[in-house]
Amino acid sequence: MKILWAALVLTLLAGCRADVEPEVEVRETAVWQSGQPWELALSRFWDYLRWVQTLSDQVQEELLSSQVTQELTLLMEDTMKELKAYKSELEKEVGPMAEDTKARLSKELQGAQARLAGDMEEVRNRLSQYRSEVQAMLGQSSEELRARLASHLRKLRKRLQRDAEELQKRLAVYKAGAQEGAERGVSAIRERLGSLMEQGRLQALTSHPLRERAQAWGEQVRGRLEKVGSQARDRLEEVREQMEEVRVKVEEQTEAFQARLKSWFEPMVEDLRRQWAELIEKVQVAVGASTSPPSQKS
C-alpha cells in the first residue's frame, strides 16, 4: 500500500512539474516580446545563455576554448550599447519634467541598469571560473563541477530575468513621466499662445488709429526725403557746372601765361643766339689770322 501511495505521489509531482515548467519557459520568452532594440539584444543574450545551460558536448567544448565567454561579452556590449541609446532618447524627451522628479527617476533607472549589467557580468565570470576549474581537473571527472554550474546558472537566470523586468518597469515609468511632462509643456505653450493671440487681437483693434497716424507720418517723411534728394541733385549739378567753368578759365589763363612767357623769352633767345654766332665768327677770324704763314722777303 505504501508503495502504491509513493508511486501515486511521484506521478502527481511529475505531472505538476510537467505542467509548471512549460509555463516558466513561456513566461521567460514572453518577457522579451517588446520591439525595443535593447530588449532584442538582451533576448539574444538570454537565448544564448539558455543554450549554454544545457551543457551539451558542444557547449563543453566551446567553454573550454573560451568561445562562449567571448560570445557573451559581445552580446553584453551590444545590449548595453542599445540600452544607453534608448535611455538617451528618453532623456531628450524629459525636458518639461520637474527637476526633482527627473533626478529621482534617473537615479532609479541607473540602479536598475547597473544591476542588469552586474548580472550579465557575473554570468560571464562564472563561466570563466568553470573553464579554469575544468582545466585544473587534468582529465578527471567534472560531473560535480557541471552540476554546480547548472545550479548556479539557474539562479543567475532567475536574477537576470527579475532585474530585466525591473529595468523594463523603470524605463516605462521614465517614458511615462517624459510623455506627461511633454504634454504639460505643450498644454502650457498652447495656453500661452492662446493668450498672446488674444492680446494681439485686442492690440490690433486698439492700434488701428495709431497705424493710420504712423502711415501718414511715414508718407510725410517720405515726401520730405524725396524733396531733399531732388534739391541735393540740383545742387550737385550746379556744383558740377561751376567746376567746369573754373576748369575752362584755368586752361585759358594757363595758355595766356604760356604765350606771355614765350613773348618774353623768344627775343632774348634770338638775341643770345645772334651774339653767340657773332662771337664764334670773331673767334674763327682771329684764329685764322694767327695761323697764316709769314710772307718771305726777296
UniProtKB/Swiss-Prot annotation:
Q: Does the keyword 4Fe-4S apply?
A: no
Where does the record locate the signal sequence feature? 1-18
Per UniProt, which keywords does this protein have? Chylomicron, Endosome, Extracellular matrix, Glycoprotein, HDL, Heparin-binding, Lipid transport, Lipid-binding, Oxidation, Phosphoprotein, Repeat, Secreted, Signal, Transport, VLDL
Which parts of this chain are annotated as the region Specificity for association with VLDL? Answer: 260-272
SUPFAM superfamilies, per the entry? Apolipoprotein A-I (SSF58113)
Renumbered to this chain, region (Lipid-binding and lipoprotein association) spans 204-272
**Start and stop residues of the sequence repeats:** 74-95, 96-117, 118-139, 140-161, 162-183, 223-244
Localization (cell): Secreted; Secreted, Extracellular space; Secreted, Extracellular space, Extracellular matrix; Extracellular vesicle
Modified positions (Methionine sulfoxide) are: 137
* Gene Ontology molecular function: cholesterol transfer activity; heparin binding; phosphatidylcholine-sterol O-acyltransferase activator activity; phospholipid binding
Q: Which domain of life is it from?
A: Eukaryota
Q: Where is this region: 8 X 22 AA approximate tandem repeats?
A: 74-244
| Residues annotated as binding heparin | 156-159, 218-225
Where is this chain primarily localised?
secreted
One family from Pfam that matches here is: Apolipoprotein
Task: Output one GO BP term.
Answer: cholesterol efflux
Q: Which InterPro entries match?
A: ApoA_E, Apolipoprotein_A1/A4/E
Q: Which residues carry this modification: Phosphoserine?
A: 141
Post-translational modification as stated in the protein's UniProt record: APOE exists as multiple glycosylated and sialylated glycoforms within cells and in plasma. The extent of glycosylation and sialylation are tissue and context specific.
Q: Which family does it belong to?
A: Belongs to the apolipoprotein A1/A4/E family.
Quote the PANTHER family the UniProt record gives. APOLIPOPROTEIN, APOLIPOPROTEIN E
Q: What is its biological role?
A: APOE is an apolipoprotein, a protein associating with lipid particles, that mainly functions in lipoprotein-mediated lipid transport between organs via the plasma and interstitial fluids. APOE is a core component of plasma lipoproteins and is involved in their production, conversion and clearance. Apolipoproteins are amphipathic molecules that interact both with lipids of the lipoprotein particle core and the aqueous environment of the plasma.
Task: Spell out the subunit comment.
Answer: Homotetramer. May interact with ABCA1; functionally associated with ABCA1 in the biogenesis of HDLs. May interact with APP/A4 amyloid-beta peptide; the interaction is extremely stable in vitro but its physiological significance is unclear. May interact with MAPT. May interact with MAP2. In the cerebrospinal fluid, interacts with secreted SORL1. Interacts with PMEL; this allows the loading of PMEL luminal fragment on ILVs to induce fibril nucleation.
What is the designated name of this protein?
Answer: Apolipoprotein E
Species of origin reads: Hydrochoerus hydrochaeris
Q: What is the name of the gene encoding this protein?
A: APOE
